[in-house]
């Protein structure tokens, strides 16, 4: 039954317990933005099974290192949270655990996302944050947690890591849309090949609610900024270090702290209100997106100092238990569907590390007051009746816990809305921040990212995976995708060209009027054979689309077109592809681009002019810029072009041609 659980490439699996088909990429939630529901048995079956598959020290984040030290509060921020350890000057015990995701218990010196988990413990509070060295996560819903980790763990047949097979890693990490931002633009850009954990920033990943004593609620994202500076290794150096010492990271941290070179981090936060999320285009429940510091500045709250190495690796590192549900008074979670994997953390502890939380490195500093007894390592023996309430004697909880100690939690931001099954993969505009990341990179960093992609994609045996990764990347960085396609072979390059051609046609739907949608649909379907692509799905999008607000994104995506004009298609792909492109006149492209600018941002009258100038480079490469734009103006397709546009385009024809040729050279460089 287990072997037949998943049905090939379908997004449906058979739930073992109920023998029924269940969507594998959706979760049952309380409304579109509400919490996950406990009655979604198929989801928890998937999550809890993963908790029990291997010993905890051989599953996720197995190649770990850790150290101990102190948290020292810099300022008094109890106004925004009631946690006991947040008063100015307060010092409590602190532990940081670093680990890589991929592999079983292999080298930590690999290009991978590195976990940065933190445990803050005092006699009055326990707070644990589980994050990594990028401010975002791989995915949105906890349902995909096991699937992503399986992609980087050992195969059952030979214990070789899945990640060692490039096509499997690419399929699971590069092609899945929510993970593109994390893996492609943080891991491959160099943030994952960190020089040392002491030179690594950390992030809490999720948004947390901070509840003040008066009941007011704030949201916060936590950052750990390395006082030693952030540093990464180039890939060649990382390979050499790994060859010399597979435990380089562990050794480096241990030796530095043994010599008294203690690393220090600043704990900073971005504090927001829910109204801030309504003004800015962010969502507190989506862990795959960054809240830019330009929008919400960082506030430094405390220092984190590590000054003691572990005495026993197994006892103090491999047995350490982090729980995203462990929160001090006044700290609460938002309705983030990924952080609700907290059930899995507790379940893992109970199944692997005893039922009484008795392991010293995991034991809370606070006095334990509850009505629980028995289980491995149980030593809290009390002469009280452990049934509450009861008519014979007060329980430990009733006797010793004052009412004032109760948590003050925030009310749900979203009112109950009924059971809804929400797709765990699709969320609006997951590529936007990847584009912004690419645009903000300097050229040297862009080259490193492209080189990393070339290596990863070229290593994939499957041509279809090469195609999928290259096409997905093209939505974000067109010129770079063309360079990757040229490096990995004609299959990826050809598919990249076809994807762009379909995108040109499908994007017309966003701009088309309702009475033109059927005509656009028919045009797309009739062109599908010419570009050798099944266009039915895109054609249906034309009929269904009514999202005029998306036109800005569409206009920006037209930046992919210079590399797919007929003039250079033969160089990148083949003459047949060049012919396919020529069936859609360049003036059509200019029309769409200009219309996008005019519809989306009418207040910025210069946008349509800029778009026209940009796309005149395409027709300039054909030596017909002035004629094409003249024909477009004569046709008056969209009523956005004027004589000034025509004159400017013609005057800049020669300059546009030179710029376009330069871009082509850049796109196919070595």
UniProtKB/Swiss-Prot annotation:
Q: Which InterPro entries match?
A: Catalase, Catalase_AS, Catalase_clade2, Catalase_clade2_helical, Catalase_core, Catalase_sf
Q: What SMART domains does the record point to?
A: Catalase (SM01060)
**Reaction catalysed by this enzyme:** 2 H2O2 = O2 + 2 H2O
| Subcellular location field | Peroxisome matrix
GO CC annotation, single: peroxisomal matrix
GO MF terms listed in the record are:
catalase activity; heme binding; metal ion binding
- Where along the chain is the active site annotated? 61, 132
Q: Which residues bind heme?
A: 345
**UniProt keywords, alphabetically:** Heme, Hydrogen peroxide, Iron, Metal-binding, Oxidoreductase, Peroxidase, Peroxisome
Q: Which family does it belong to?
A: Belongs to the catalase family.
Q: How does it assemble?
A: Homotetramer.
This chain belongs to which protein, by name? Catalase
């Amino acid at each position: 039954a287990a072997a037949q659980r998943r049905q090939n490439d379908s997004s449906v699996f058979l739930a073992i317990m109920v023998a029924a088909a269940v969507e594998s990429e959706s979760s049952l939630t309380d409304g579109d933005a509400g919490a996950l529901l406990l009655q979604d048995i198929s989801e928890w079956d998937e999550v809890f099974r993963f908790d029990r598959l291997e010993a905890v020290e051989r599953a996720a984040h197995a190649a770990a290192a850790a150290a101990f030290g102190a948290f020292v509060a810099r300022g008094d921020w109890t106004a925004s949270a009631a946690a006991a350890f947040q008063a100015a000057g307060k010092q409590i015990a602190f532990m940081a655990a670093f680990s890589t995701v991929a592999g079983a218990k292999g080298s930590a010196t690999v290009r991978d996302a590195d976990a940065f988990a933190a445990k803050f413990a005092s006699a009055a509070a326990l707070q644990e944050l589980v994050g990594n060295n990028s401010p975002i996560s791989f995915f949105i819903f906890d349902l995909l947690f096991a699937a992503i980790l399986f992609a980087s763990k050992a195969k059952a047949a030979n214990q070789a890591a899945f990640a060692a097979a490039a096509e499997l890693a690419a399929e699971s990490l590069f092609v899945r849309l929510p993970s593109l931002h994390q893996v492609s633009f943080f891991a491959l850009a160099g943030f994952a090949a960190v020089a040392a954990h002491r030179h690594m920033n950390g992030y809490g990943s999720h948004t947390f609610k901070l509840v003040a004593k008066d009941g007011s609620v704030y949201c916060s994202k936590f950052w750990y900024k390395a006082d030693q500076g952030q540093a990464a290794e180039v890939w060649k150096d990382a390979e050499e270090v790994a060859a010399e010492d597979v435990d380089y990271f562990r050794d480096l941290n241990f030796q530095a702290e043994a010599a008294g070179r203690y690393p220090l981090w600043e704990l900073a936060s971005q504090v927001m209100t829910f109204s801030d999320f309504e003004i800015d285009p962010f969502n507190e429940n989506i862990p795959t997106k960054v809240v830019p510091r330009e929008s919400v500045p960082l506030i430094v709250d405390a220092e984190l100092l590590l000054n003691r190495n572990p005495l026993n690796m197994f006892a103090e590192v491999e047995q350490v238990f982090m729980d995203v549900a462990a929160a001090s008074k006044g700290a609460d979670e938002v309705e983030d569907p990924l952080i609700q994997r907290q059930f899995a953390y507790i379940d893992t502890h109970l199944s692997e590390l005893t039922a009484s939380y008795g392991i010293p490195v995991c034991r809370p500093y606070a006095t334990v007051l509850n009505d629980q007894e028995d289980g491995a390592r149980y030593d809290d023996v009390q002469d009280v009746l452990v049934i509450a309430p009861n008519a014979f004697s007060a329980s430990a909880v009733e006797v010793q816990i004052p009412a004032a100690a109760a948590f003050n939690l925030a009310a749900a931001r979203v009112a109950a809305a009924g059971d809804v099954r929400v797709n765990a993969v699709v969320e609006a505009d997951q590529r936007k921040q990847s584009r912004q990341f690419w645009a903000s990179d300097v050229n040297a960093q862009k080259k490193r990212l492209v080189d990393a992609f070339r290596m990863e994609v070229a290593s994939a045996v499957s041509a279809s995976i090469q195609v999928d990764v290259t096409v997905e990347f093209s939505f974000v960085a067109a010129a770079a995708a063309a360079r990757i396609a040229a490096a990995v072979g004609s299959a990826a390059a050809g598919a990249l060209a076809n994807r762009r051609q379909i995108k040109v046609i499908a994007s017309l739907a966003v701009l088309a009027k309702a009475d033109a949608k059927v005509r656009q649909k028919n045009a797309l379907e009739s062109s599908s054979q010419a570009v050798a692509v099944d266009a039915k799905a895109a054609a249906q999008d034309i009929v269904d689309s009514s999202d005029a607000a998306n036109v800005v994104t569409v206009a920006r995506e037209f930046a992919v077109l210079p590399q797919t004009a007929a003039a250079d298609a033969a160089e990148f792909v083949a003459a047949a592809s060049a012919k396919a492109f020529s069936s859609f006149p360049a003036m059509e492209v200019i029309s769409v681009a200009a219309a996008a600018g005019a519809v989306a941002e009418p207040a910025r009258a210069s946008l349509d002019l800029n778009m026209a100038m940009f796309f005149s480079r395409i027709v300039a490469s054909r030596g017909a810029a002035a004629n094409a734009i003249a024909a477009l103006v004569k046709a008056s397709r969209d009523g956005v072009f004027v004589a000034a546009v025509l004159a400017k385009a013609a005057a800049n024809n020669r300059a546009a041609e030179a710029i376009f040729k330069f871009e082509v050279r850049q796109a196919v460089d070595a």
